[in-house]
């Protein structure tokens, strides 16, 4: 009995000692709280919280800062911005999903059609003379812009020739609107000799296309359509100007000032709408 009582006493003494060491004292709690406060939530002299190296908010803030720093550099290396309409690359699950096949097939067909039209116009926009002929035939910047946007929109990723597409489009737009420099002079002038020579050198097919474009614009102008309506019909400002020249407007500026002013307003409206 004495041995049993002795063992029971030793057990209670050991248990009490373990509980005593495991229970935190008030001093240790205060010390630990101060340490955590000092490590995680320090405050500067202005009363603003200072993030620590292991703070999750600081890590996220640094990651956002790195993204904002690297993004402009990535765009500069690419030389061109991805079109906002460009479709992101489809995931494997999306490709295997039969429900997405009709849409993907439709996108492929529209992309092929846009590429087909682009190939047809390559010879028509390869140099300054070919661009001049295309303008006389009624090719407008809006037509090229639609082809460009379709290629970017229906491609599953950035087209491999994205930079060239943008460059060719910008070259055509610059040369197109450069033809109106004489229109805004006082008095307005039109370079007739250049276009008469190009017209004489055209093939019979090209001359038919040119006359068709002039007749089409003539019908719209004679009907008195507003500028908004003319823009919606994609009436070429250049063909419009050539129509006035053929009607002798620029030979008698004083008596045709209203027609010339209407053309000026339309050219500006067309350019503004194109840049939207």
UniProtKB/Swiss-Prot annotation:
Tree of life domain: Eukaryota
Keywords of this entry: Host cytoplasm, Host nucleus, Secreted, Signal, Virulence
Coiled coil: none
Signal peptide start and end residues: 1-18
Keyword Signal set for record: yes
Motif (RxLR-dEER): 49-64
Compartments, as annotated in UniProt: Secreted; Host nucleus; Host cytoplasm
Cellular compartments per GO CC: extracellular region; host cell cytoplasm; host cell nucleus
Its biological purpose: Secreted effector that partially suppresses the host cell death induced by cell death-inducing proteins.
Family under the similarity heading: Belongs to the RxLR effector family.
Domain comment quoted from the record: The RxLR-dEER motif acts to carry the protein into the host cell cytoplasm through binding to cell surface phosphatidylinositol-3-phosphate.
Full protein name: Secreted RxLR effector protein 150
